[in-house]
């Protein structure tokens, strides 16, 4: 009995450790990206190049983990037809999301960017209805209205609003919503389930190619114009490694808990980012209106996640089989973008 109790406590400790690791890495990566892009010491104001570096690093590490070291097994079922019709669009939207989201940090504060991202469920719902994946209902309209109202109030309370940054951030939100829609279409039409490492194994190279083309035309000339490349490669490598570690932490949390846990942790992370950024960055000045509006939006997001999880749970009960805990569907309606 004592051994069983110790084993349970040990399992609980490990679970909470993974959750705290996810919150720390997710929050820290956002601050890390902001610092790399805006710091004069690092001198790397190239969001497209930073995102491209992340995807190349992720591609190499995923290849090493799955094909060389064989620590993680790549999920089977991927075909050329699925890759062309589903993975490439997902990779393109993923690249667009990270690129525009990182670019927004050059114009707006981390806290305000996080507040704007709360509108994500609204974009996903609207596109989902257009794609035939969501049904319009009074309850969902009420939830979407609450989220939208909260984001509007938070935006109204922003002291130093920069509309260029807002446009970039909203573009990132639309890209992420499209990515989630493509992923849900892939799940419903093909029935493919991948763990995060397998997902990044397939998506990262595609995203890297999608980013490389605009990088050649938009940023390479700027970098070359500043003289010989003399960047802090240790810092950039560490930044890329932290991004990959964040993706791995998502895998660990989901495999030891559930999708509900990662979403609750995501809400906690959002508040941590908003509050801590006010202490770390001089461009972040929170107001009572900011926080009040964001609280309203988060309440709407929580209601949305609860509604979606109940809907998903009713499906899982009849279809779940042993071993499913280590694979997650290629869809997440919450704000779980790991690199922004």
From Swiss-Prot:
One of its GO terms (cellular component) is membrane. The chain crosses the membrane at residues 12-32, 44-64, 80-100, 110-130, 141-161, 163-183, 197-217, 234-254, 260-282, 286-305. Residues 330-340 have a biased composition (Polar residues). It comes from the Eukaryota. It is a multi-pass membrane protein. It is found in: Membrane. Keywords: Membrane, Sugar transport, Transmembrane, Transmembrane helix, Transport. Residues 320-340 are annotated as: Disordered. InterPro entries: Sugar_P_trans_dom, TPT_transporter. Its main location: membrane. PANTHER family: SOLUTE CARRIER FAMILY 35. Belongs to the TPT transporter family. TPT (TC 2.A.7.9) subfamily. This is Probable sugar phosphate/phosphate translocator At3g14410. It comes from Arabidopsis thaliana. The lineage of its organism: Eukaryota, Viridiplantae, Streptophyta, Embryophyta, Tracheophyta.
């Amino acid at each position: 009995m004592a051994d069983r109790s110790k084993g349970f406590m040990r399992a609980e400790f490990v679970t909470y450790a993974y959750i705290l690791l996810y919150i720390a890495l997710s929050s820290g990566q956002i601050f890390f990206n902001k610092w790399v892009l805006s710091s004069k010491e690092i001198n790397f104001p190239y969001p497209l190049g930073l995102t491209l570096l992340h995807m190349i690093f992720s591609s190499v590490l995923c290849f090493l983990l799955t094909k060389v070291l064989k620590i993680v097994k790549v999920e089977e079922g991927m075909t050329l037809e699925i890759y062309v019709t589903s993975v490439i669009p997902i990779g393109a939207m993923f690249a667009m999301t990270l690129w525009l989201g990182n670019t927004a940090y050059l114009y707006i504060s981390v806290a305000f960017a996080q507040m704007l991202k709360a509108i994500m469920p609204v974009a996903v719902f609207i596109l989902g209805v257009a794609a035939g994946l969501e049904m319009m209902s009074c309850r969902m309209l009420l939830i979407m209205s609450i989220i939208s109202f909260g984001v509007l109030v938070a935006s109204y309370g922003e002291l130093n609003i920069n509309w260029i940054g807002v446009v970039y951030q909203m573009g990132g939100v639309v890209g992420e919503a499209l990515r989630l829609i493509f992923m849900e279409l892939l799940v419903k039409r093909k029935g493919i389930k991948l763990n995060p490492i397998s997902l990044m194994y397939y998506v990262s190279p595609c995203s890297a190619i999608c980013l490389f083309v605009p990088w050649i035309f938009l940023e390479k000339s700027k970098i070359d114009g500043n003289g010989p490349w003399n960047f802090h490669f240790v810092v950039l490598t560490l930044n890329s490694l932290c991004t990959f570690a964040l993706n791995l932490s998502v895998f660990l949390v989901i495999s030891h808990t559930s999708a509900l846990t990662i979403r609750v942790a995501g809400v906690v992370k959002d508040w941590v980012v908003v509050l801590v950024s006010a202490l770390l960055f001089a461009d972040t000045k929170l107001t009572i209106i900011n926080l009040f509006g964001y609280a309203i939006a988060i309440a709407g997001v929580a209601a949305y996640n609860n509604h979606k999880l109940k809907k998903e749970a009713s499906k899982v009960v009849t279809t779940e089989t042993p071993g499913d805990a280590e694979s997650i569907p290629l869809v997440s309606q919450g704000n779980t973008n790991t690199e922004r």
